[in-house]
């Protein structure tokens, strides 16, 4: 069972429950050698740091003394780990040696027998440099083994959860096919396999594309494990692309070769030995100088170096979790990807998939948008803004430029004449910023350095296309000046209320429809904050319809506002339909759980304000969804909507 608690980009801070044990994602599974004598780092430390580990059932199966202990006392006793134990099936050995001495069903039976929490099918790992014909034939065999494994578990009543590994080599259409076929089977976790050769060769562009082409066709309600990814420098990008689990043998393997892991790359202890101190404050690095560690006996040096590598690995995972909570995961990704040019390739290629990524990225975040380089131009926040500009119902448009020194929000620092013309400011990052919505996230909640000339030109094509699309409504400067002069001569009673007009445009941008018609425009009023002087509420006959949330200026409906949205928005827009059995709970304002969602607006994005209705489209409640439209239909566990209020009968 998987539940999302917080999110940013496609990264998910979540909770997996397996056999009554909980794993917080994203997380790393340290690889544990099934032979305790060969385990580099003590299991006492592993038990303190990890919620989940991964070990090899094939080595256990083929080593008589290990097999005997595992079969009599269980895998947890063998490796001395109390929480969730995942096992590989021998697929790695198959990829290295070309053959294994165990059958696909035999290894499933064995994993169940030794009490594994999450087992793995014996799939066929297909490297990146094989022919398409070979990749296709391997995939067909993996599908057969997967189907047989699921059938075996069901027929035998096995309790173990199962990994269904996605294969397909470097062929993206085969990765898609693998995800589609495997996704229809009842697997609990979906590892993306055979990417280690790509990572070893720094082919991060291909790694990113393999992840995305798999994610697009996998069920959203199941965790995704990037098999073999153990270097912390790749975690942030992989999490941002939707990976929840990683496994690391790197902490031990690198230590044996004297390699010192950092979040930005790998250093060699031999090259560091003359430094006064380590660039780390973990227990190992605090107690030893580089020279002291380097001069230790080999076995002890390897153990301590492995401990450091494990510390820095978990530290990066914790840093990513915090970034998800704070809403600045993209900034961390951009920072990490600048640590190596090949990683930057991985970041740049994802712009091709922004239509997919944007669907998972929250519409609003705790942190502002920080521009850290040219790649920031392709972030989902900007992509979404450009798409949603077409939600605004324009009558007359004037496009202009402002001085680079003009502070945001623009409308507070320009002498703009109030009228019913939509004035759009050319913006180097966001393309166009309508003055009437310029306080909404992320248009005012951003920090951008002085742009280079080539960056300033990035949005020229977008602006030209927008103007061409709306050419009949575009005013030139002479017409605009004539119009505002003419408008200024109108009687006060004939003029629009600029604050109400502004809020109307904000509602269009946020909800994609005209919420305030002409009649309402004359009836509603705004109320400004006494502290900031900014618009805080929209009212109808002294009753609050919407509150402009201070941090992002999104319009949050009160009960009457929700009723207005329900009236103005056509079904299924911004709706979530729930089962009749929980109608009364919704009316009472209690959270809506995923398993009770029957239908929804497929275009919903995470953290949008939604209307909760029954099958007759009767408004029951209103609140915020943590899931997008597709996820709402696929998740069957955890909270779907946090309600702000319910409508009692």
Curated annotation (Swiss-Prot):
Binds 1 zinc ion per subunit. It is an enzyme of class 2 (transferase). One of its GO terms (cellular component) is cytoplasm. It catalyses: guanosine(15) in tRNA + 7-cyano-7-deazaguanine = 7-cyano-7-carbaguanosine(15) in tRNA + guanine. Residues 573-648 form the PUA domain. Its cofactor is Zn(2+). GO terms for molecular function: pentosyltransferase activity; RNA binding; zinc ion binding. Its EC number is 2.4.2.48. Zn(2+) binds at residues 280, 282, 285. Substrate binds at residues 123, 194. Pathway: tRNA modification; archaeosine-tRNA biosynthesis. The active site is at residue 88. Keywords: Glycosyltransferase, Metal-binding, Transferase, tRNA processing, Zinc. Belongs to the archaeosine tRNA-ribosyltransferase family. Exchanges the guanine residue with 7-cyano-7-deazaguanine (preQ0) at position 15 in the dihydrouridine loop (D-loop) of archaeal tRNAs. This is tRNA-guanine(15) transglycosylase.
């Amino acid at each position: 069972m998987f539940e999302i608690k917080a999110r940013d980009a496609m990264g998910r801070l979540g909770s997996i429950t397996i056999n009554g044990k909980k794993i917080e994602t994203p997380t790393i599974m340290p690889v544990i050698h099934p032979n305790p004598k060969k385990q580099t780092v003590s299991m006492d430390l592993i038990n303190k740091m990890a919620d989940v580990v991964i070990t090899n059932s094939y080595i256990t199966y083929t080593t008589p003394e290990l097999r005997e202990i595992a079969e009599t006392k269980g895998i947890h006793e063998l490796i001395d780990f109390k929480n969730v134990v995942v096992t590989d099936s021998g697929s790695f050995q198959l990829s290295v040696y070309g053959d294994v001495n165990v059958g696909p069903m035999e290894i499933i039976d064995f994993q169940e027998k030794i009490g594994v929490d999450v087992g793995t099918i014996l799939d066929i790992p297909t490297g990146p440099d094989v022919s398409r014909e070979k990749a296709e034939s391997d995939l067909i065999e993996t599908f057969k083994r997967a189907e047989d494994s699921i059938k075996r578990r069901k027929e035998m009543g096995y309790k173990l959860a199962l990994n269904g590994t996605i294969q397909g080599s470097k062929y993206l259409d085969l990765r898609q096919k693998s995800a589609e076929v495997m996704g229809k089977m009842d697997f609990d976790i979906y590892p993306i396999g055979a990417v280690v050769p790509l990572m070893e060769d720094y082919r991060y562009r291909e790694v990113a594309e393999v992840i995305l082409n798999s994610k697009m066709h996998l069920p959203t309600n199941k965790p995704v494990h990037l098999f073999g990814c153990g270097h912390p420098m790749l975690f942030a990008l992989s999490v941002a692309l939707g990976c929840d689990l990683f496994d690391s043998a790197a902490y031990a393997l690198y230590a044996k070769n004297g390699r010192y892991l950092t979040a930005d790359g790998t250093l060699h202890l031999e090259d560091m030995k003359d430094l006064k101190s380590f660039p780390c404050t973990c227990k190992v690095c605090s107690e030893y100088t580089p020279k002291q560690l380097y001069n230790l006996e080999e076995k002890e040096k390897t153990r301590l170096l492995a401990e450091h590598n494990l510390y820095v690995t978990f530290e990066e995972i914790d840093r990513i979790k915090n970034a998800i909570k704070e809403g600045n995961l993209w900034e961390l990704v951009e920072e990490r990807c600048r640590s190596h040019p090949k990683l930057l390739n991985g970041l740049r290629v994802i712009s091709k998939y922004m239509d997919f990524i944007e669907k998972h990225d929250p519409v609003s975040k705790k942190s502002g948008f920080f521009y850290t380089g040219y790649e920031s131009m392709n972030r989902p926040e900007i992509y979404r803004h450009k798409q949603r500009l077409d939600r605004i119902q324009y009558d007359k448009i004037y496009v202009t430029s402002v001085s680079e020194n003009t502070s945001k929000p623009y409308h507070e620092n320009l002498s703009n004449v109030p009228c019913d013309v939509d004035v759009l400011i050319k913006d180097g990052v966001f393309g166009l910023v309508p003055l009437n919505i310029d306080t909404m996230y992320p248009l005012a909640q951003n920090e951008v350095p002085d742009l280079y000339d080539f960056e300033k030109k990035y949005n020229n094509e977008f602006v030209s296309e927008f103007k061409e699309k709306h050419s009949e409504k575009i005013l030139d400067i002479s017409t605009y000046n004539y119009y505002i002069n003419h408008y200024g001569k109108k009687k006060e009673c004939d003029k629009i209320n600029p604050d109400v007009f502004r809020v109307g445009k904000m509602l269009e941008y946020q909800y994609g429809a005209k919420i305030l018609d002409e009649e309402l425009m004359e009836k509603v009023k705004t109320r400004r904050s006494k502290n900031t002087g900014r618009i805080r509420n929209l009212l109808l006959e002294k009753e609050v319809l919407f509150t402009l949330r201070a941090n992002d200026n999104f319009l949050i409906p009160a009960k009457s506002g929700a009723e207005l949205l329900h009236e103005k928005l056509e079904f299924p827009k911004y709706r979530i339909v729930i089962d009749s059995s929980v109608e009364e709970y919704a009316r009472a304002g209690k959270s809506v759980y995923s398993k009770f969602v029957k239908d929804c607006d497929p275009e919903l994005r995470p953290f949008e304000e939604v209307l909760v209705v029954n099958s007759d489209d009767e408004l029951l409640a209103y609140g915020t969804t943590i899931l997008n439209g597709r996820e709402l239909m696929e998740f069957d566990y955890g909270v779907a909507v946090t309600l702000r209020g319910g409508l009692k009968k």
